[in-house]
Amino acid sequence: MAADTHQRGAAKTARNPVKIDLEQSGQLLRKPSWIRVRSSNSQKYLEVKRLLRENRLHTVCEEASCPNIGECFGRGTATFMILGDLCTRRCPFCDVAHGRPHAPDPDEPMHLANSIAVLKLNYVVITSVDRDDLRDGGAQHFADCIRAIRTQSPQTRIEILVPDFRGRLEVALEKLSACPPDVMNHNLETVPRLYKQCRPGADYMHSLQLLKDFKAAFPHIPTKSGLMLGLGETDEEIIEVMRDLRAHQVDMLTVGQYLQPSKGHHPVMRYVSPEDFKTFERIATNLGFSHAACGPMVRSSYHADQQAHEAGIE
């Protein structure tokens, strides 16, 4: 595979152990009235896009076709995606392209820090593709980016949304310990029964261990995770995952509706009503999460600054 090959949709998931039923995927559920995406062509939206291109930066907002991109860019916020735009995994719910990535760009931390300083952002989220090709999974690059941002914008709070560092957990946590974030986020995405189908290459217990080990090393730093509904899970399974997260000392939670990027992706199995999301939010609060954001359009980094503020991060 060429280094610049971008595989998406059916081409990306063709080699997955559990195949997507494209016939079922073609029978799309009608989107309910509460699923509404706001478009934006505001000056701030255009300014953010221009600055990203000038600095050769990627955002998960664009690469994953996030439905909230117009609102977030319009507010002058973005979730920056480091380590390129090619992922070594083939998750069928995700619209980020699969391929053989290039080597990490040594100038990316500086470009990222420059952009954040120009935009005068108070809170940023840094995420990445999975980099199974790197010995540390990309952890050193995360630390370099955090350090560069703090050098130029010491008041900016930094949340990182990391891959699972599977097979590299110990070395990854060692790298991050040199320059830890203000919030540590790693998404479980779905329930353990659906991992082989929805997260090929990942392991549910490993992801929980990542969150627990980070919390053990940095008890004062909030940990966070996110789930998508509509992949085939049951309500009872979601509640059980919430319990697992609390048992592994996770502080914050996001739960949102899965939206199918294309017919080549995993189909939407159900649309969860706003009322049911509110029920999940009440359950999460009762389980002891310091903050839980649950709603159809909630994403792990959507209004992350507000979530962090409500959880006590200034």
Curated annotation (Swiss-Prot):
The cofactor binding remark recorded in the entry reads:
Binds 2 [4Fe-4S] clusters per subunit. One cluster is coordinated with 3 cysteines and an exchangeable S-adenosyl-L-methionine.
Q: What is its EC number?
A: 2.8.1.8
Keywords assigned by UniProt, alphabetized: 4Fe-4S, Cytoplasm, Iron, Iron-sulfur, Metal-binding, S-adenosyl-L-methionine, Transferase
Q: From which domain of life does this come?
A: Bacteria
For this UniProt entry, the molecular function terms from Gene Ontology, in alphabetical order, are: 4 iron, 4 sulfur cluster binding; lipoate synthase activity; metal ion binding
- Please name the SMART domains in this protein's record: Elp3
The reactions it catalyses are: [[Fe-S] cluster scaffold protein carrying a second [4Fe-4S](2+) cluster] + N(6)-octanoyl-L-lysyl-[protein] + 2 oxidized [2Fe-2S]-[ferredoxin] + 2 S-adenosyl-L-methionine + 4 H(+) = [[Fe-S] cluster scaffold protein] + N(6)-[(R)-dihydrolipoyl]-L-lysyl-[protein] + 4 Fe(3+) + 2 hydrogen sulfide + 2 5'-deoxyadenosine + 2 L-methionine + 2 reduced [2Fe-2S]-[ferredoxin]
GO CC annotations, alphabetized = cytoplasm
To which pathway does this protein belong? Protein modification; protein lipoylation via endogenous pathway; protein N(6)-(lipoyl)lysine from octanoyl-[acyl-carrier-protein]: step 2/2
The broad enzyme category this protein falls into is: transferase
Radical SAM core domain mapped to chain residues: 73-290
Annotated [4Fe-4S] cluster 2 binding lies at C87, C91, C94
Task: Cite the binding residues for [4Fe-4S] cluster 1.
Answer: C61, C66, C72, S301
Q: Which Gene3D superfamilies match?
A: Aldolase class I (3.20.20.70)
Pfam families membership: LIAS_N (PF16881), Radical_SAM (PF04055)
Location comes to:
Cytoplasm
Give the cofactors, semicolon-separated: [4Fe-4S] cluster
| PANTHER family with a match to the protein in the record | LIPOYL SYNTHASE, LIPOYL SYNTHASE, MITOCHONDRIAL
- Family assignment from sequence similarity: Belongs to the radical SAM superfamily. Lipoyl synthase family.
UniProt name for this protein: Lipoyl synthase
Say which species the protein is native to.
Answer: Nitrosomonas europaea (strain ATCC 19718 / CIP 103999 / KCTC 2705 / NBRC 14298)
Corresponding gene?
lipA
